Structure formats: C-alpha cells, structure tokens
Amino acid sequence: MKYILVTGGVISGVGKGIIASSIGTILKSCGLRVTAIKIDPYINIDAGTFSPYEHGEVFVLNDGGEVDLDLGNYERFLDINLYKDNNITTGKIYQQVINRERRGDYLGKTVQVVPHITDAIQEWVLNQAKVPVDRDQKEPQICVIELGGTIGDIEGMPFIEAFRQFQFKAKRENFCNIHVSLVPQPSATGEQKTKPTQNSVRALRGLGLSPDLIVCRSAKPIEMAVKQKISMFCHVEPEQVIFVHDVSSTYRVPILLQEQGIIKYFKQRLSIPIEDQPSTQLFKWKRMADRYERLLKTCSIALVGKYTKLSDCYTSVFKALEHSALAINHKLNLMYIDSADLEPSMKAQDPVKYHKAWEELCKAEGILVPGGFGLRGTEGKIQAITWARERKIPFLGICLGMQLAVVEFARNILKMTDANSTEFDPNTKNPAVIDMPEHHPGDMGGTMRLGSRKTVFKTSESVVKKLYDNQDFVEERHRHRYEVNPELVQQFEEKGLKFVGQDNEGQRMEIIELEGHPYFVGVQFHPEFCSRPMKPSPPYLGFMLAASGKLNTYVQNGCKLSPRNSYSEHSDESSSDS
C-alpha cells in the first residue's frame, strides 16, 4: 500500500480537494486502484448537523454517512463509492479513544494525545485504506489522504504528529507528502510572492514532515524564476515544484499535473511499476476538458434555493447539471435565486431585489428546486414551482423540491388552499407532506432516512424510467425526514400528478411526474450524489435535455447519446470529439 498525504498552507480553501482528486485520477488512469480519505480536524462527529454556510453542502454516501463535500470530489473524479469511515474527524477519533478508556482497554494508563490519539489516527488510516471502493471489490493499492485546514492550525496538530510517526512505519518508499500552497500576486506590484510558501514549508518541516512535491496555486501561470526561487528556498528540486493556476474548469487540473511529469515522479518516488504515459482514461478527461472550453451554446437554469449566497452549498447539484450540460454539448449558465426574494412580502420590503429575482426566473429555460430544511423561503419556492407548472417550463424538484411540488399541486389543483408540510405547519388540516413514522424527535445527527435505497418503478409509461434505461428499479441516495402523505396519493393521480416511483412496499412516494408537461419531475432522493463527469445522473440529464429542447429526440432514439443525434446538432458551435 502506498500513501500520499496532501497538506495545505497559507490559507484554507486553496484547492487541496481538487488536487487530491486529480492525483487520484492520474494514478487510476495508470491502472492502479485508488482510495481516498479526508481528515477534518473539527470535533463534530460528522457533517450532518452543519449549516451549509459553515461548510458547504453535506455529501451523503451509500452507507448513509454525512460527510464533507470533498468526498464528493473524490467519488466524481475517481468513480468510486466511499464509506463514512473515509471521513475522519477529531470527534470520531476522540469518541473512539474515550470509549476504549471507559471499557478499560488502556489498563489504567493515563490517556494522552501522544500516543493514544495519534495511534488511533494511524490505526484508522491503515484499516480504512484497505477497504475496497471500486466495483470489482479489490483492495486499493494507493490511498490519497487529504488533511483539512492549514499547517499551524491547533486543531490539526494531533494529525500532523500522527503522520510524522506514520511515515516511518510505512517506510519512505510507501509514503510521500504533497504540500499545496498559495502564491499570491498583489495587484499593487503584480509580482508573484513566494514568502508565504517558504514560511508554510518551514512550518511543516518544523513539525516533522518534509514535502516531496510543492503544488503552487495561483491566479495566473507562475513564472520560471518563481519556480526556481521556491526550489532553492524550500530545499526541493525544480521538478518537485508543480504549478496549478486557475483554469477554465476543474477537468483541466489532472491534465495540468500530468503535463508537469507527476506520473514519472510518482513512479520513481514510490517505486510504482507504471508506464510514464497514462491510459486512455486520462485522454478522455483531456477530450472532455477541451470540449468544455469549446462550447458556445448556453442553457440557462434557475436554481431556486435557500442557501444561494455560497455556491458550495449546492456543489453536487451544480456538478450534476454541468455533467449533463457537457454531455449534450451545452454550456451551463446557472442562476442562483434566493427563494425568499420571490415572495410577495419581498415586493414591499425590497422591490428592486424582488423584481430582479423574478426577471432572472423568467429568463430561465429550466427551473430546479433543490433539497433543504426550514421554513424560510418555502413560499418563494412554491411560487417558482407554480410558474414552471403553468408555463410548461422544465422543472426538477429534489427532496424538499419534490415535496413542495406536491404541496403546490394540492393548493392550486386540488384546491386545498391551506395544504402544507407538517415540517412547516404541524397543525395544517391538509398535510400533503408528513413526517415519517420512524423519525423520532430528539438528537439531530443521523436521525434521517439516509443512504442508498431502492426505488421501484410502478409503470412503464414514465420518462424517468426511460432515462434510467428502462430498469425496473434504481438505487439512489436519500436524506430526508418527511414524505408525501400516502392518503392523498389517489387524489393527486386522478388530477394528473403521477407517482411513478415508490419504495419496495409501495408506501413511500419517491418519483413524481406531471401529465401533459414537457418535463415536470420530482424525486425524493438526491441523484446528484451519484452523477459522474462521464456518466451524468439520468434525472438531471433529462432535465437539461428538456431545457435545451432535445428530450423528445433523445427518448425517440432509445435514450442514447451519440455524435449523430446530439453533438453534430451543434457542429457550428462545438466540435465533436467522437
């Protein structure tokens, strides 16, 4: 087993997750089996109770783990399925050690950060690195470990010490450290500054770890003189300094790393028997990145949500839309609309904001309402759903988005004017959405219906079933506490809102479709978590096809994308790579 530790310096959010994912992608393209571990040095047990504004979206895994969004990057880039134990937090480590102490496992010894916490970290990494994450269920050969935060953070010190010890246990030929640092370029001088990187590397060395590769992040390509300066002052060879400047898309990052000889370096440094040139998989990434940069035709989508001030809150939704747009040769123009701005109360409070929100909604070729929690902005989401339904604009509702589509239909079609979800109005006389029987109030963490669940199609006359290649059932990831009221299902279906997908027992409604509408779909699950760059999520793909006016042709052609029936349609806008 080979271990690659990715650390960060200067500032957080410098792009360690994308760098780690890209390194994994390159090594996987060389025929190696790769897994990934993300370490978050916070005391929370998991990410499930975080505000999206604190840490971005909560990514859900097949086993129901609620984890950091970087694990979503790993899954998308590497096309693997990780587990909740691939996300290590300080809270998990301390909980494990304290439980052992309570059981008497330490035989009365004084339990300390060194050696007990550091040993627990190393043990966790060793065990989890062996867990298969590919479809063939074979043990991984490479484990990429990302340490969250920056060098010098007090929260990360136990982990740094653990890996200082770990490098000797693993042996030099099995362990290397990649340090990601920022090279700022102040506008006042226009000069790229190396001092922050020098200080960061010095701090890392002072803690017992020496970087094997220094990945320098910058806004613009770094000059050769800067590379030589970093090489000299950070005591590494020039080829050990890698540049990653801002690029048009994250798909370009693995190509950027590969072009700077990173495969040859890993082959020598970790004694890996691989070819210097990657397999066709990385060439597919290059073609995808090239095609992304050539796209001219745009499809405008309105994302009507609650957490629109920070795009990280909807990372997986954005990526799923981007994957689908790329598959049909369109550039995605995603407009984030705060749902509260669409509400009538906003018209009196801030008319400019209200009219701007509605102007953007009116320009959208498709409307998406994602998952969420809480009352704020729900009426604005319902307004957007009404707009999409009445004007036959393609609509996709995810989790809460589907539930609110049901509420909107109950109010405006079934004439239950006070219909609502019991989440927002526990005393409503017409509960269109109710809390699930197995949900018990109390602890917030881990109390939802989480993880991969089976959804069975109840009819062959379903556009979503066709998008899923006419499978009898699908398995997608869930994260919710509420469900559609099964007592109202018959009334909904009589008026044209069909529940085409249900759980195994036929009691829980999972997929809705509206008759007579180009694409009005709601899903209780989160298909964005399983979308991949080269395998877009079917509900998102159908949504983008409908928004671009290509859905009917796609369905008539047996739901197959080919150069003849998709890319060549816009040969004047984008070259075909096939």
UniProtKB/Swiss-Prot annotation:
Cross-referenced InterPro entries: Class_I_gatase-like (IPR029062), CTP_synthase (IPR004468), CTP_synthase_N (IPR017456), GATASE (IPR017926), GATase1_CTP_Synthase (IPR033828), P-loop_NTPase (IPR027417)
Pfam families per the UniProt record, alphabetical: CTP_synth_N, GATase
Active site, UniProt feature: 399 (for gatase activity), 526 (for gatase activity), 528 (for gatase activity)
One cellular-component annotation, GO: cytoplasm
Residues annotated as signal peptide: none
CDD domains: CTPS_N (cd03113), GATase1_CTP_Synthase (cd01746)
GO-annotated molecular function: ATP binding; CTP synthase activity; identical protein binding
Uppermost EC category: ligase
Pathways involved: Pyrimidine metabolism; CTP biosynthesis via de novo pathway; CTP from UDP: step 2/2
Domain Glutamine amidotransferase type-1: 300-553
Catalysis performed (reactions): UTP + L-glutamine + ATP + H2O = CTP + L-glutamate + ADP + phosphate + 2 H(+)
Keywords: ATP-binding, Glutamine amidotransferase, Ligase, Nucleotide-binding, Pyrimidine biosynthesis
PROSITE patterns: GATASE_TYPE_1
One GO-annotated biological process of the protein: pyrimidine nucleobase biosynthetic process
E.C. number(s) listed in UniProt: 6.3.4.2
Family of the protein in this entry: Belongs to the CTP synthase family.
Function of the protein: Catalyzes the ATP-dependent amination of UTP to CTP with either L-glutamine or ammonia as the source of nitrogen. Constitutes the rate-limiting enzyme in the synthesis of cytosine nucleotides.
Name the UniProt record assigns to this protein: CTP synthase 2
